[in-house]
Structure formats: C-alpha cells, structure tokens
Amino acid sequence: MQGVADILFLKGVDLGIVRSDTLDYLEKKGYANNIKKQFTFITKLYNEEMHVLAPKSINSMAELEGKTVAVDMPNGGTFVTSAIVFERLGIHANFAYIEQRLAFEKLKKGEIDAMISVQGKPSKFNSSVKDENLHFLPVDYAKSLQPDYLPAQLTSEDYPSLIPKGERIDTIAAPAVLAAYNWAPNTERYRRLARFVDAFFNKVATLQQPPFHPKWKEVALNAPLAGWSRFRPAQEWLDRNSSTLASADTRRRFDQFLGDNQARAFARPEDREALFRQFMDWQKRQPMTR
C-alpha cells in the first residue's frame, strides 16, 4: 500500500511498483472510491510468490485456522495479499504485524505459528533460512483465488535448504505492476512518462538476458491486466512493435516448453538454437485455429 500512497501523495513521484491486488483491496475495504481512475498501468512486471513458512507439525493452510500468523507490517503488500487469500479461502487466523526478521525468531521459538512473505523467488530472506523443523505450506490454486492470482511453484532449486531435492511446493503468485498516476495528456508529467515508456520498453529485451535477474524474463509488455487502463503511449508503443513482441513471446513459450530439466540437457547455445528452429518448423505445420 505504501507504493500506492507514494504515487498519489509524494511530491515528484510519477510511477511505482504495486501489486495488482492492492487497488481492489483498498476500494473494497472502503479506503478509497474509484481509485483505479487515478491510476494507469505501464506494464505487468514480474510475479511475486506467496511463501508460507511454518513448523513441520502444520501441513496445510487449513490448519492455520485460529493460529497466529505473521504478515509483516500492515501497510505492506504481504499483508494485503495475505488478507485477501485468507478471506477467500475462509481461514480465520490471527494476524500479527511483525517485521520479517523478528517474526522468524518468534517462529523458531514457537511464539507464532507461521509467517508469510510475498516476494519474488528465490527471495533473499527465505534463501537464508536453514532450519530442519520448518517447511513451506502449499497454497492451492483455489477457484476463489483465480481472478487475481497466478499458479506458481517453489522448487528445491529455489530453496535447497527448505525443499527436498526434486520436490516442488504449489503456491500462488501476485503480479507486480508498473503503475503511474493518471496525468492529463497536456501536462509535462504525462510527457515525461511517455519518454520513460519509450526508453524502458526498448531496453526490456536486454534486461531479460544475463547477467540481469531471472525475474526480468517474466515481464510481458503486452500482457493485459483486468480492471486496469493502460497508459496510452505504452499502448501505442505496443501497437507499433507488435510483430517484434510476437517473436519474443514465441521465444518465451519455447523456453517454457523446454523446462528446467530439458534446459540442462541443451545447455550449449548451438543445441538450443537448433531445437528452437525445429520448434518453429513444428509450429508452422500445426493447423490454424480460429
């Protein structure tokens, strides 16, 4: 929620990163009316996964009924996502507003029953956890969560000290959004945002390559966002570059098709390129669907 407040009220701030579920939460809880009309979105960025850390004596989200769960501070994204998820799953937990490091100490001492963090994997904090008595709880992709969240997994590659080798934990992810204040088109602030869009969109392909963070690969510039209006210069850029984006999307689908295990088998660039050409030939032979 802090990101939303900064965009609305902090002098000189034109845009920021917010979770896609935050504006809906503020509106439904009566904190603001028609708040989405004050915002526009540039693009969907990366996904932030829900990490529910608990003792091994607790095995499911349902077992957190009536338990004490740390959800970080009440003005943060972890709190908002936790509040929405627990409400939609019908789980009534006692939320404790405790900073992450302190919450971890309380969890180890048994003073709380679980702690939640919603962060892009692998998160620095969860990667540092080494306690054989703790594990991640699975978060099922229930129908009630599907309008606002995406299915995700935490793997042993992400957290080797918390997840046994070769295993995966189902969870959900909240999309992070690059959002901006909805300035009028005839203002200098609007024109500055338009210049930013042009510079940023032209650099995204570079940011999706090493040595930059793997999360950049989740950025899909042309991905729609339900209930949000896209900044007009951003949409105009997408319209001008639609063919280039289609090619990039094909490459991304190919990488997903390969998967982690197959990717290791085709580690050499020349092997991956040869397989990619076969993949493209296969796509061309597929019947058109309407």
Indicate residue ranges for each PLM-predicted region.
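Short, glycine-/small- and polar/acidic-enriched structural segments
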Residues: M1-E63, A70-M73
